[in-house]
Amino acid sequence: MNLSNISAVKVLTLVVSAAIAGQVCAAESIVNYESANAISKQPEGSVRFIVKYKDGTPSSQGLKTRSTTKVMASGMQVAGFEAQFVRTTGLGAGIFAVPELKTTKEAHLVMDTIASNPDVEFVEVDRLAYPKAAPNDPSYRQQWHYFGNYGVKANKVWDRGFTGQGVVVSVVDTGILDHVDLNGNMLPGYDFISSAPNARDGDQRDNNPADEGDWFDNWDCGGYPDPRREKKFSTWHGSHVAGTIAAVTNNGVGVAGVAYGAKVIPVRVLGKCGGYDSDITDGMYWSAGGHIDGVPDNQNPAQVVNMSLGGGGGCSQNSQRMIDKTTNLGALIVIAAGNENQDASRTWPSSCNNVLSVGATTPKGKRAPFSNYGARVHLAAPGTNILSTIDVGQAGPVRSSYGMKAGTSMAAPHVSGVAALVISAANSIGKTLTPSELSDILVRTTSRFNGRLDRGLGSGIVDANAAVNAVLGDQNRAQPRPPVNQPINSGNKVYRSDRRVAIRDLRSVTSGIRVNDQARVGSANITLTLDIRYGDRSQLAVELIAPSGRVYPIYHDGKRQPNIVGPATFSVKNERLQGTWTLKVTDKARGVTGSIDSWSLTF
């Protein structure tokens, strides 16, 4: 046993000895029980835990001396299971593998044992995420999704000279192919897959983000006897996503990209059987310029991070904190809402704060039948019959090709590409946009769906031309909309609810205010004033839902401090003002409760 092994044993021994001594401080630790719900569907031997120790504690100091890349064999025991220290993360948490663990009940026992150590800040299962796409008819059609009636109108922006030039977008996905329509727009990336069997390239983390294929044989990835988990061919998912964002254009070959003047950083986090939460968030953070121990720093920080991936359950502690760190670096994080035809609050990372969650639409401007929906979806983009870059290989790469896919995975890169177009337009006039400003522009300049949708997909379909007009201050050139009543900007009419609503663990609650004496449809400056009493506001997601069903995320600082109290002012355009406005608050973790004490709207 080398020194690293000895130190690793000492770190986990603190956990075990605390449990034996009866020093139960679980109330001070966050235990994410929900993260264990899908363990029975994972491949055998794949269960890992993320353990974050409180800063300055002996356990935290012990982790700081660990290697981030080398898996260390050891004989550690936790609740009767052998555990192996894997590495530390960009958050400073430790990853521990428990190969013999098989059930949710066993995972709860292990987490409770770990949480009994007073040094522990939170513990959760290192969940697996998967690409959010499904194969579709590979025959060639027009790329309607760029310029059709319900496309993103990228062609109108290209005609004005904005192509995403000078902007860097990272694609956190399955890696990248050697492809004639991609190579010219690729920057150096990295492979963050820490599991050698999943990586398929003979090692773990390295500087080669090449896609080795994510194919698998019958039930290699768990889920027996579910026929959906039978063998699958390689998806070339990351390359399809990258091609939508920035395929080389005007080269007489293949397809175009939304922001073909931008550059892409490929970050490989998904391999055979998906990828771990901890690898995904490390890759995300690194791509935006964050430092990860054991990995060379990225010299081309991304302004937009595309993550067309996800898994079941609410946002994890690890995901939310790494998302916040990435956003603080100045990157907008664009997420696929998911393909389960369910409320997006039930999947991650679309259920996290500080992300832009994207649903999928059809060529007719309707919700794609597979697309997730609900208050967590901020806007939509084309997600069916999307033509982009792939390979003909069913296992490993064989020859460059093109094919159509469907999914919210295909919708998200349209938004990432449009975000790059908007940033390049802002750069042309010396304007710098924060992630929240960029998100706001994309959400409030969307074009309309084709009639009323069966389920909510946010504000509308992303509109590149209208978004660029907004950042340039040329609203008169935005895409026309139906006539609306004149703007309302009185600023002196207050609507208030003093009905107290309890906030309980892992649930969403709502409170409504009825507005009857404003224009039916119009534009307004609205001040939302909140009085939410809660012990840890980092665990809350807050949204305001208009009578039309449009969702306005209410961003707060995300700090681990109590209460959300005070005003937030924002503008709405062509919005339905009459009807019931709904405040929705979602509790994302166990251990803390509170209440909506009151809230008000001022028009």
From Swiss-Prot:
Domain of life: Bacteria
SUPFAM superfamilies tied to this protein: Galactose-binding domain-like, Subtilisin-like
CC per GO annotation: extracellular region
Pfam families, A to Z: P_proprotein (PF01483), Peptidase_S8 (PF00082)
CDD domains linked: Peptidases_S8_13
Example GO molecular function: serine-type endopeptidase activity
Cleaved signal peptide residues: 1-21
InterPro entries tied to this protein: Galactose-bd-like_sf, P_dom, Peptidase_S8/S53_dom, Peptidase_S8/S53_dom_sf, Peptidase_S8_Asp-AS, Peptidase_S8_His-AS, Peptidase_S8_Ser-AS, Peptidase_S8_subtilisin-like
Protein name, per record: Extracellular basic protease
Active-site residue numbers: 173, 237, 409
Keyword presence, Electron transport: no
